[in-house]
């Protein structure tokens, strides 16, 4: 198999994996109000796809998943969002861990 074909095949597999992660994220978002355990399972599947294909989880998905207990985070339901000292602090209500993301202040 030529090298170019192998690279194209790898890119195709990565694109399919990202599409599946996006779809599972949408399903987790829709399923959370009725069945939070199913949304947690969808998050586990997202992580499995990411690890199996050795690609990173997209940023918009990664910011909605707890880095400690891997719960699907919904503001006001099981997560608390606060702005403190130039950071967005997301607190998971299930495990109590905090994640901090810097944000740029307007001058």
Curated annotation (Swiss-Prot):
EC number, UniProt record: 3.1.26.5
Protein name: Ribonuclease P protein component 4
Locations listed in the record: Cytoplasm
Major location category of this protein: cytoplasm
Listed GO CC annotations: cytoplasm; ribonuclease P complex
Protein task: Part of ribonuclease P, a protein complex that generates mature tRNA molecules by cleaving their 5'-ends.
Residues that, per the record, bind Zn(2+): 66, 69, 92, 95
Provenance organism: Methanosarcina acetivorans (strain ATCC 35395 / DSM 2834 / JCM 12185 / C2A)
Classification via InterPro entries: RNP4, Rpr2/Snm1/Rpp21
Catalytic activity: Endonucleolytic cleavage of RNA, removing 5'-extranucleotides from tRNA precursor
GO function term, MF aspect, one: zinc ion binding
Gene designation: rnp4
Keywords: Cytoplasm, Endonuclease, Hydrolase, Metal-binding, Nuclease, tRNA processing, Zinc
């Amino acid at each position: 198999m030529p090298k170019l074909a192998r690279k194209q095949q790898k890119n195709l597999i990565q694109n399919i994996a990202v599409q599946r992660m996006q779809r599972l994220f949408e399903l987790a978002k829709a399923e959370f109000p009725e069945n939070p355990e199913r949304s947690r399972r969808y998050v586990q599947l997202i992580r499995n796809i990411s690890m199996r294909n050795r690609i990173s989880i997209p940023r918009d998905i990664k910011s909605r998943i707890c880095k400690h207990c891997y719960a699907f985070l919904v503001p006001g339901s099981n997560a608390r969002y606060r702005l403190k000292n130039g950071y967005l602090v997301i607190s998971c209500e299930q495990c109590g861990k905090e994640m901090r993301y810097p944000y740029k202040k307007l001058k």
